[in-house]
């Protein structure tokens, strides 16, 4: 049976395929429970289900599809690679295509190939995160890691240990030891109850003092790992001066600074990498999702000083995905040629509703219950019931998006970078309508 011969069954419905999926796949499946559709085809910012209904896609493979679905240049790259005679899988053997992709990607890192080298990892962001921590421990000879509340770094054993959300962690015993969590700045829900500049200043001082205090009780870590914009944690943007202090302190104490750019990277924030908003240079950059142009690929950018690997010190069978390197090269070229970083910045600043935060096309809207008293910094309690109802109402209005953040109360928009002004207007119109419908359903108002 070929791919082209797999057509929807006669008169098949979404329910038909979802029922079959529930019968054949593990209970672990997640997205179909919130977005109950079976996708037949997709193009750009739109997907069409097996019943012929079209949806605006503001999920985009959790940010993987920077150029949207089935971009002509991406499809052409796949066809060209298949026709070229290149092997699809090369371990870490080199090819002309890999050489071109490596050079193009290095050019986007601060200082380029003079400052950084690349390491190709397994196919997922979690694989690259695991490799980054292993490298930091190899380089420093130390064993502990500092991560941050609200952070997300993957679902594997080690990466889950460094992730803030407890729902997945509570079911697993014996995660990687030696992870120390620290508070991450959050203007709307400041962990110190201060908010504003006072909260940022206090957290900046706290981090520096924690590292330098000989009575802190925590030995010097091998690495500090963080996201410049927390995605799954609710689209929380790190303040510039806090990030700059993290860089200053880690550099002073020879602690490896790892920036997880798996979701925020590749122009989504309005710059190629989200850490660029603070003007810093990480020691290790974790890249996946958009780096492969929609196909599985994960890469580390490593400052040459920290490239402590011995030959074959870290390997992985699927680190030589030629199709992904080809499509990744197309994404890099298209981002530059069409100035998609600027497009992300402009579309992200389009007037919107609610409590919006983030950068570029990485946007979060936190849903609260304004009827209940605000806390000491003026933030109302989260309303998870209403947030879930809004997501459902968005789906019913043919708009696909995800929730995240604490208690699942942040509506997240990860639109493809190619989204047009007209499509942004349509997203907002559908979202407004969904919010109004959800309010009636939940509160009768």
From Swiss-Prot:
Identify the cofactor(s): pyridoxal 5'-phosphate
Can you tell me which residues the record assigns to a coiled coil?
Answer: none
Write down which residues bear the modification named N6-(pyridoxal phosphate)lysine: 289
- Pathway(s) the chain acts in: Amine and polyamine biosynthesis; 1,3-diaminopropane biosynthesis; 1,3-diaminopropane from L-aspartate 4-semialdehyde: step 1/2
Is Disulfide bond found in the keyword set? no
Record flagged with keyword Transferase: yes
What is its EC class? Answer: transferase
**SUPFAM superfamilies in the record:** PLP-dependent transferases
- Keywords, ordered alphabetically: Aminotransferase, Pyridoxal phosphate, Transferase
| Gene Ontology molecular function terms on file | diaminobutyrate-2-oxoglutarate transaminase activity; pyridoxal phosphate binding
* Pfam families, per the entry: Aminotran_3
Please cite one Gene Ontology biological process associated with this protein: biosynthetic process
| EC number of the protein | 2.6.1.76
**Which family is this protein grouped under?**
Belongs to the class-III pyridoxal-phosphate-dependent aminotransferase family.
Question: Which NCBIfam families does the record match to this protein?
Answer: dat (TIGR00709), PRK06931.1 (NF005386)
Quaternary structure, per UniProt, is:
Homotetramer.
Query: In its UniProt entry, what is this protein called?
Result: Diaminobutyrate--2-oxoglutarate aminotransferase
